Amino acid sequence: MQLDDRKLKILQAIIRNYLETGEPVGSRTISKYTDLNLSSATIRNEMSDLEELGYIIQPHTSAGRIPSDKGYRLYVDTMMEDKVTEVENMRDMLLEKADKMETLLQQVARLLAVNTNYATMVTSPQYRSRKVKFLQVSEVDTTQILTIIVLEGNIVKNKIIAIAEPLDKETLLKLNIVLNTFLQGLDLSEINLALIRQMKEQAAEHSSVVSDILDAVAQAISEEDDIQIFTSGATNILKYPELNDMEKASELLYTLEEKKQLTNLMNNEVSSGENRGIQVYIGNETPVDSMKDCAVVTATYQIEEGVYGKIGIIGPKRMDYEKVVSTLQNLMCQLDDIFKKDNDR
């Protein structure tokens, strides 16, 4: 059932009042909060309909109402207003100590926690497509060669390969030329049988070594990197009464230290709310059990084509969604600027 304008305005008033106060909202509060000029009795009837439709619920201990997950979802998808958040310019602060990517991402998590007053998390970059940038084969000893594989994003993989007989310098040089000529700029799906056949023909009597090197390349491209997750502001969430229950709080704090669950959360793609790549998960939409009383807002940052990571903000379901989305948009613009300048060097 589609809500009429009156119900939408009342629902919006309930949600906004609850976001501000954290207290259940009654009909008298709504009559003062809106310009509908409705009696308390009429508002009560409308609230009863909204409750029956699943947009608001009544806590056991209160006569007022609070938004349900369904109500929050409607608010996030259709009622949020563009909000210009006066966030301090993060760019200079991010660059101040960001001598390497790890430090930059730690700074991102810390500054977001300070600016939003929620818990934050940032993943290290991941790679959607892994293309071969450069290969180098060198001798370790008479029975082994070292294959250095540089992938897109400057990921370096080292593979030791056993060989049946020693390779002289001329042969190693020839192998390096053949490998780089055929493989540079390709990903695993592009290394087909016809290409392998051509490479083996070029390598002549050393075709078996080429096969072993190709196996090493395929393994390097397919390997998953160890994703790092940087968190900050975990204790911020304890400031909100609905999240400071001892048992729930301890589970939530444990989750924020549990890498596997955070990785599942950050890699979850099921959500609406496509706002410049920003995703909003509310209550039961989150894939992590201990976060069913939370809202999670995530965004994707991109360093270069195919190289991306995730940023997440965790708070109560009554979080200031407009501020969080605006802050993330602001941050994404500043990160884009930082990464663009790095790539232009």
UniProtKB/Swiss-Prot annotation:
SUPFAM superfamilies: GAF domain-like, Winged helix' DNA-binding domain. Pfam families: HrcA. The keyword Ribonucleoprotein does not apply. GO terms for biological process: negative regulation of DNA-templated transcription. GO terms for molecular function: DNA binding. Keywords: Repressor, Stress response, Transcription, Transcription regulation. NCBIfam families: hrcA (TIGR00331). Belongs to the HrcA family. Negative regulator of class I heat shock genes (grpE-dnaK-dnaJ and groELS operons). Prevents heat-shock induction of these operons. This is Heat-inducible transcription repressor HrcA. The gene is hrcA.
